[in-house]
Amino acid sequence: MLPIGQKFYTRTKHRIQQGKKTAGAWLQIGSPFTAEILGRAGFDWLMIDMEHGPGDIMTLIAQLQAMKGYGVDAFVRAPWNDFVTVKRILDAGANGVLIP
């Protein structure tokens, strides 16, 4: 939880605010190994697709853990528009959520 008044920044948001381009990749394979490989590839962000991909919340947690430490922002496309699901995605450690 952020202290009151502190803004939430990600590497991707910071680069966009500076007018710089970002590069990312879309993950539809529910594998932490793929997430780690792409996390190490130098992308600014990765989008984990839970809407059309095979992953559930446990797969997501494994993917986020595999990406951690490589400086890549992790965004997640939620499987549906449900606030409980969105909260679970954010609690798992995602930097942002795309809601279909």
Describe the role of every protein-language-model region:
Residues M1-P100:
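Expand to "…catalyze enediolate/carbanion chemistry for C-C bond making/breaking, isomerization
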